[in-house]
């Protein structure tokens, strides 16, 4: 399945779960946990085969949920949008080891993405390791990940 299709399914599932949460919807921490878990599962599914891939999905989902919940507790929609756009730009165009920053002038939250090693995985996809750092309310948190291009360039 293409990465874009997976992302759309995750977004749809997240919005449906928010609707089930009652008046006011899910809070930022709940949304962060849900999206972090889904994103972690998606990243974990890129590694291994058979049972190894299932382990990757499980570990990715767990780590993503924990980190997503912590980060989501303090990030608002504008923070998430800025972080997402910055991540995409950093992974596509920035040299390894450089920081690509974002800053929300409304609340002072900020962060940066540091793209690292570029490599080809076992299925021939081009992938890139990265570090994402966010500072929310003066508290810094880091996440590490890998992002891979799909055959269609997405």
Swiss-Prot record:
A lipid is attached at residue 20 (N-palmitoyl cysteine). It comes from the Bacteria. It is a lipid-anchor. Keywords: Cell outer membrane, Lipoprotein, Membrane, Palmitate, Signal. Residues 1-19 form the signal peptide. GO terms for cellular component: cell outer membrane. Disulfide bonds: none annotated. Its main location: membrane. The keyword Protein transport does not apply. A lipid is attached at residue 20 (S-diacylglycerol cysteine). InterPro entries: Anti_2, Gly_zipper_2TM_dom, Surface_antigen_Rickettsia. Belongs to the rickettsiale 17 kDa surface antigen family. This is 17 kDa surface antigen. It comes from Rickettsia montanensis. The gene is omp.
């Amino acid at each position: 399945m293409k990465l874009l299709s997976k992302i759309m399914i995750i977004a749809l599932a997240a919005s449906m779960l928010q609707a089930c949460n009652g008046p006011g919807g899910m809070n930022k921490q709940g949304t962060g946990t849900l999206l972090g878990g889904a994103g972690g599962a998606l990243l974990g599914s890129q590694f291994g085969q058979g049972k190894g891939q299932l382990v990757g999905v499980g570990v990715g989902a767990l780590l993503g949920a924990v980190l997503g919940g912590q980060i989501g507790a303090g990030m608002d929609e504008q923070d998430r949008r800025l972080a997402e756009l910055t991540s995409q730009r950093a992974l596509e165009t920035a040299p390894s080891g450089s920081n690509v920053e974002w800053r929300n002038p409304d609340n002072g939250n900020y962060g940066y993405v540091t793209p690292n090693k570029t490599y080809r995985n076992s299925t021939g996809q081009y992938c890139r390791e990265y570090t994402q750092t966010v500072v929310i309310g003066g508290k810094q948190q880091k996440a590490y990940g890998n992002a891979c291009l799909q055959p269609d360039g997405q």
